[in-house]
């Protein structure tokens, strides 16, 4: 039997190892957007969420990538070759949209849109049942570039550590999969990234 802990940050992973955990059973990738030091990656995530087209989304994902890769890399490093199950982003996107006027203004300026357009885009994200809405695997299907970026961050982090002779054992969890076709779609993206 293997007993694992959960972790939300590299520091959590180190603490889990100190406690004797035999791996991380759930590393929620989106928790890098909460807490200390999260302001810049959260801002890039917000840019990605509010992007109006593929080019805007790709630019935001490219800005977000180094933050995500670093968090994953340091978590894998902390676990010293023990398994780390990394769950791809799961929460509904509207949870990450700023609610205070100062942050809304900053985001609108970065996107080169006015406050009304930001509000329109934000309203379009609201759902009547967020638990069953546009999140998890469904987000990855409608925007495969989001899954691709996360998979690339995980795999590059592991490869960089391997080149430093640090053993890693990353595992990828695809959240909220309800049908085989959903799983197959996301699995193909991850495997394509792995061989590229």
Regions found by a protein language model. Give the residues of each.
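Conserved alpha/beta-domain cores
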Residues: 4-196
